[in-house]
Amino acid sequence: MIHLFPKRKKRMLILCACYLALVGVYLALNRAANPIPVLLIAAVGLAIVVISQYLTAFNMHSQLLARLYNQLDAEGFLRDYEPKLQLPLRNQNIALSVRLHTSNAYCAQGRFDEAIALLSAFTVKPTKNAEDDLLSRFAIVSNLCYCAEQKNDLPAARQYMDELLALKAKLEAMQASKPEKKRMVFSTELNEQCLSFLETGKADVGVLQKLVQSNTQQLHKITISLWIARVYLSENNRREGEKLLAQIVKLAPDLYPGKVAAQLLAGLPAKSGEEPA
């Protein structure tokens, strides 16, 4: 992750260079000293410097992601994270990760076309690890499908879903040869439930609720909860739907889920005995 923080990387290189220079000066001034233990100590010290800088970069990245996924500050997150799209990242997984997180922030703001454009422009280059390549494409298509679903673009969502299920089948076939404890699970439940709701007006609330409960990120909890609320309303369960929508508005009033929830609340017919708004 240090490649995402050029200043931190530059600082690490400077520290390493200074450290090695000091070791060189010490050996030059103490020619009688045995160089082997000095170099061993230097290697340990150098490793500590490098590891500490990598850990710092990792923590900085985690804090940035927390702003988006748990603090729900999409605008602040993008202000600091979006410029990383311009970094010359050689590691394909890191480059994709940056795009996935950025696209999630775009979606949180309702900027689905920009999210789709960002993800569609990324080509997974073949590597020696075919499974990793499929995993990368699976992540991209899953997000693209979700964007299309939130735009209510059924043809695109169905096309992405078909590709997603095909990728899932290939990945599961690869996992079949591995010990059971080492097998990965590839979930398409959220995409399937959302598409089912758009196509048929029905979705399994129980499945969606389990996805909310198993998710640790507040942003995703809220986004899934919006779908649950829509299902409740379609089932004429106004009480639960209204309750959930009010919670979403309270938690994320400035984000896309909160704004949609507010619109749905405003569009509800007045209850018996109440004056229309």
List each language-model region with its residue ranges.
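Helix-turn-helix repeat elements of alpha-solenoid scaffolds
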Residues: 34-40, 66-82, 107-122, 154-167, ...
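Flexible helix-coil transition and linker loops at the boundaries of alpha-helical arrays
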Residues: 85-92, 124-134, 168-182, 212-216
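Structural signature of alpha-solenoid helical repeat junctions
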Residues: 94, 132-139, 156, 177-187, ...
